[in-house]
A protein has these predicted regions:
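Intrinsically disordered, low-complexity boundary segments flanking structured domains
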Residues: 12, 41-46
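Mixed-charge, Lys/Arg-rich low-complexity intrinsically disordered regions
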Residues: 1-13, 18-22, 29-32, 104-108
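Short, solvent-exposed secondary-structure boundary/capping segments
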Residues: 32-41
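Residue-level recognition of conserved beta-strand positions in structured domain cores
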Residues: 25-27, 59
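Intrinsically disordered, low-complexity, charged/polar segments
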Residues: 46-108
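Generic, low-specificity signal for short hydrophobic/alpha-helical stretches with a mild N-terminal bias
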Residues: 5-7, 14, 39, 71, ...
Length: 108
């Protein structure tokens, strides 16, 4: 039986290990669950393993905000204490406090 445990939790702020963006976790897949086309678009020498958690992030960088799908190996915790400036954060979470966002109601 396949078992995995996510390192990061819903509402946690994380940043990408290699690229200049950060975000708040709003969903987690136990293993890769996107399209083959999405995966194949990643340069072969940078492709993450599929058998690890993948995180859905409400992400931001210096220019914009967006939704990102990132493997666990490419994330690190963000300890900046700064909230994420994404317009959809309030749809999922309560006010930013103590470095994370509490869940807003029930998520499916």
């Amino acid at each position: 039986m396949f078992k995995t445990r996510a390192k990061y939790h819903l509402g946690q702020v994380v940043r990408h290990r290699k690229h200049p963006f950060r975000g708040v976790v709003f969903d987690v897949d136990a293993m890769f669950s996107n399209t083959d086309a999405w995966y194949e678009a990643i340069p072969e020498d940078s492709r993450p393993k599929k058998d690890q958690p993948f995180y859905h992030l409400l992400a931001e960088n210096d220019q914009s905000f967006y939704v990102a799908y990132v493997s666990e190996q490419n994330l690190v915790a963000d300890y900046s204490g700064e909230p994420v400036d994404h317009p959809d954060v309030d749809d999922f979470f309560g006010p930013f406090s103590d470095g994370h966002y509490p869940l807003q109601g029930q998520l499916n």
